[in-house]
Amino acid sequence: MSLDPAIAAKLKRNDAGLFSAVAQEKSTGDVLMVAWMDDEALARTLETRKGTYYSRSRQQYWVKGETSGHTQYVHEVRLDCDGDSVLLIVDQEGAACHTGTHTCFDTDVLLAAEQ
């Protein structure tokens, strides 16, 4: 698969050719996770509507839930104003975090909401 050249032209990548991808749950608005994508991962996501990312440590693509069953159905993909990050609006089945929690952002609260 290859990414539409019009979309590719809008992306700003880091030195490794990657950009960040934020997954947000459609029904709750919860931010679920942040991962990396490159053009191929984005093209696969747009084609299949499955959250597809690039693993920097394994140097390979991975589809969310492919081994765990905790899948992401992608409803929308939005590009941020700088072109260096995408937002995926998803339906999350099961845990989004590899630790087994719903979101990767529920472990350490560094600043709590004021009461």
From Swiss-Prot:
What family is this?
Belongs to the PRA-CH family.
Gene Ontology MF: a single term: magnesium ion binding
User: What Gene3D superfamilies would the database entry show?
Assistant: Phosphoribosyl-AMP cyclohydrolase
State the SUPFAM superfamilies in the record: HisI-like
Please give the catalytic activity noted in the UniProt record.
Answer: 1-(5-phospho-beta-D-ribosyl)-5'-AMP + H2O = 1-(5-phospho-beta-D-ribosyl)-5-[(5-phospho-beta-D-ribosylamino)methylideneamino]imidazole-4-carboxamide
Pathway it acts in? Amino-acid biosynthesis; L-histidine biosynthesis; L-histidine from 5-phospho-alpha-D-ribose 1-diphosphate: step 3/9
Q: Does the keyword Magnesium apply?
A: yes
Q: Which gene encodes it?
A: hisI
Quote the record's binding site residues for Mg(2+).
D80, D82, D84
Supply the EC number(s): 3.5.4.19
Would you tell me the Gene Ontology cellular component terms?
cytoplasm
- Tell me which residues bind Zn(2+): C81, C97, C104
UniProt lineage:
Bacteria, Bacillati, Actinomycetota, Actinomycetes, Mycobacteriales
Q: What is this protein called?
A: Phosphoribosyl-AMP cyclohydrolase
Query: GO:BP terms for this protein?
Result: L-histidine biosynthetic process
Q: Where in the cell is it found?
A: Cytoplasm
| Residue ranges of the TM segments | none
